């Protein structure tokens, strides 16, 4: 069975880059009828917060990205300890003691000699006596994974065939001196034991993937199929990472972006397929194809979300917004008409409040000086509310007869006086919604 996972660290709010990863993994699982796991990588005890874990789940639920099971790495520490013991027994974990300063000096020396800055495996040469002496000096050992120095190859679902020489990569640190397991190790253990079959993540993880393939094999499992999507840039190609805090899913939700708009854009961004609004995840899954995605950096512009949001909200059935409309105070008998009229003239659902304010308390009349006398005369011909579907036609005919005006010179000033806007819904539909007309005085 196809099994994918989204594994965020609950150290902050998830952003559009995280969503792209989550969505790709979700769609792969759904298209195959498989399992989608939400795994909270919360082994960083200092930075992981429950409020962020709750926020991640809230964001995914808002988007409809429901998970089949949820896992927390903090609940699996015993499994990592057992796996580490197995690797030690197999000679694949070795203890090292270098300080960050010593490692930095080694790197600089290697670079000055024209060599790649790869860890020199000095820890392998330490005797038991050496280690005891270092501990007596107050040093705490940490643990590296011994890579087989061979080429690590895989068929990447997006990047194609990848080959990395393990000799050019430092043996990764898997366990810190305080015993905390690091991402590379915990993730490998989880992916192996949870039966993850496909992993899609950012191209900045390619080197991690090479080392994790060896770790997973050392654990006695076969690695999953990997794919690495391009990284996002800003609209002008600028680095986006510094701005991701302002592009959190929470902030986009609160700004009024429709979930369908965000999903539709992120499911196609960076692919050869055109971005089209899809109102369901089933539709997105049906057309999803990793083979359509390219390796080049992908431009993301938040402004692209607004036309899609407008389209999504305009096509939304009344049943989805009835409670929201009722909460505005719209009478039951006007709810259907109000949605029919307002839905085609909003971008965000929050815009509905502005339209109901116009209809319920009256708009501030917009009257050009040259139209003041015309409007004053016209308003004498408009009876007080309530109005019907016929009111607009009857009213404008009466004004036309009384003033001789016609066409735009007739309709535009009247619209601006009644609604405070030069453009908007069909006035014959608007009139029955008007509770107050300020222009009547």
Swiss-Prot record:
The reaction(s) this protein catalyses: tRNA(Glu) + L-glutamate + ATP = L-glutamyl-tRNA(Glu) + AMP + diphosphate
EC class (word): ligase
Top-rank taxon: Bacteria
Residues reported in the UniProt entry to bind ATP: 242
Gene3D superfamilies, per the entry: 1.10.10.350, HUPs
InterPro entries found in the cross-reference section: aa-tRNA-synth_I_cd-bd, aa-tRNA-synth_I_codon-bd_sub2, aa-tRNA-synth_I_CS, aa_tRNA-synth_I_cd-bd_sf, Glu-tRNA-ligase_bac/mito, Glu/Gln-tRNA-synth, Glu/Gln-tRNA-synth_Ib_cat-dom, GluQ/Sye
Major location category of this protein: cytoplasm
PROSITE patterns registered for this protein in UniProt: AA_TRNA_LIGASE_I
UniProt keywords, alphabetically: Aminoacyl-tRNA synthetase, ATP-binding, Cytoplasm, Ligase, Nucleotide-binding, Protein biosynthesis
Enzyme Commission number(s): 6.1.1.17
Keyword Nucleotide-binding found: yes
An annotated Gene Ontology molecular function: ATP binding
GO cellular component, one term: cytoplasm
Biological-process GO terms, alphabetical: glutamyl-tRNA aminoacylation
One Pfam family in the UniProt entry: Anticodon_2
Motif ('KMSKS' region): 239-243
Subcellular location, record wording: Cytoplasm
Residues passing through the membrane, by range: none
Residue ranges annotated as motif 'HIGH' region: 8-18
Complex formation: Monomer.
Protein purpose: Catalyzes the attachment of glutamate to tRNA(Glu) in a two-step reaction: glutamate is first activated by ATP to form Glu-AMP and then transferred to the acceptor end of tRNA(Glu).
Similarity remark: Belongs to the class-I aminoacyl-tRNA synthetase family. Glutamate--tRNA ligase type 1 subfamily.
Protein name: Glutamate--tRNA ligase 1
Gene name linked to the record: gltX1
């Amino acid at each position: 069975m196809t099994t994918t996972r989204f594994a965020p660290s609950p150290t902050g709010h998830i952003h559009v880059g995280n969503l792209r990863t989550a969505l790709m993994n979700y769609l792969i699982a759904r298209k195959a009828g498989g399992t989608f796991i939400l795994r909270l990588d919360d082994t960083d005890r200092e930075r992981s917060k429950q409020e962020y874990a709750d926020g991640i789940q809230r964001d995914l639920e808002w988007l409809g990205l429901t998970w089949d099971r949820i896992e927390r790495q903090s609940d699996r520490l015993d499994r990592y300890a057992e796996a580490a013991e197995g690797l030690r027994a197999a000679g694949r974990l070795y203890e090292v003691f270098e300080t960050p300063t010593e490692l930095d000096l080694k790197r600089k020396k290697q670079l000055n000699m024209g060599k790649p800055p790869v860890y020199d495996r000095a820890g392998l040469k330490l005797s038991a006596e050496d280690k005891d002496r270092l501990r007596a000096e107050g040093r705490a050992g940490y643990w590296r994974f011994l890579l087989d120095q061979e080429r690590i190859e895989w068929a990447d679902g997006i990047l194609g065939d990848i080959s990395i020489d393990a000799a050019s990569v430092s043996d990764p640190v898997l366990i810190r001196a305080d015993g905390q397991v690091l991402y590379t190790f915990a993730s490998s253990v989880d992916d192996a034991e949870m039966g993850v079959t496909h992993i899609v993540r950012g191209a900045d993880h390619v080197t991690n993937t090479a080392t994790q393939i060896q770790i997973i094999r050392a654990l006695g499992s076969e690695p999953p199929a990997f794919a690495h999507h391009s990284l996002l840039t800003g609209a002008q190609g600028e680095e986006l990472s510094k701005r991701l805090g302002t592009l959190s899913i929470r902030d986009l939700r609160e700004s009024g972006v429709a979930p369908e708009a965000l999903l539709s854009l992120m499911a196609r961004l960076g692919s050869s397929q055109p971005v089209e609004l899809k109102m369901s995840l089933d539709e997105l899954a049906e057309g999803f194809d990793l083979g359509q995605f390219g390796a080049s950096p992908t431009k993301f512009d938040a402004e692209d979300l607004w036309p899609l949001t407008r389209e999504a909200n305009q096509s939304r059935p009344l049943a989805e917004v009835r409670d929201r409309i009722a909460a505005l105070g719209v009478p039951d008998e006007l709810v259907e008409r109000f949605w029919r009229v307002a839905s085609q003239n909003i971008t965000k659902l929050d815009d509905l409040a502005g339209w109901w304010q116009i209809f319920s308390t009256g708009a501030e009349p917009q009257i050009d000086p040259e139209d003041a006398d015309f409007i004053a005369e016209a308003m004498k011909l408009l009876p007080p509310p309530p109005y019907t579907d016929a009111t607009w036609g009857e009213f404008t005919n009466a004004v036309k007869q009384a003033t001789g005006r016609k066409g735009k010179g007739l309709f535009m000033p009247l619209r601006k006086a009644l609604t405070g806007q030069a453009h908007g819904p069909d006035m014959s539909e608007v009139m029955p919604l008007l509770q107050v007309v300020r222009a009547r005085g």
